[in-house]
Amino acid sequence: MMNDPDLPSVLALADISKRARYGSSVFFNSNLHINQTNVCVLACRFCAFRRGPSATDAYSLDIEEYLARLAPFSEYIDEVHTVGGLHPEWTIEHYEMLFSSIKQNYPHVSVKALTAVEIKHL
């Protein structure tokens, strides 16, 4: 499909396939993005988000702070995207505790997290 220059035909085939499976139903999700930290060990030239650990505007949300940011939106969303920098002190166990806490408090919310770079860092 990505190599087909006839995009209208590809879109028409996708619509036929979707209608065969789901009829005229359309599905949406409602999500929230929470940046748990801007502290990052990398210094990518294109990144304006990253801060070093000692920067005056560096922040790292602990799990309680993260949940407090999620709480006001929890009844309106079905997924949370958690993203941030490559924190020098956070281990996979930190993220396991964060994800477990989210699911314990908000079982209906799916967690979308960890980019490939974040996974490699851990």
Model-derived features: where do they sit?
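An N-cap/entry alpha-helix motif that binds or orients negatively charged groups
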Residues: 1-27
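Conserved short loop/turn motifs at secondary-structure junctions
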Residues: 1-2, 30-35, 84-88, 117
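Conserved, mostly hydrophobic/aromatic
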Residues: 14, 44, 82
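Active-site phosphate/pyrophosphate- and oxyanion-stabilizing loops and adjacent acidic/basic residues
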Residues: 15-16, 34, 100
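Canonical Radical SAM [4Fe-4S] cluster-binding loop centered on the CxxxCxxC motif
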Residues: 20-22, 26-65
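Core AdoMet radical
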Residues: 51-67, 73-94, 98-99, 103-122
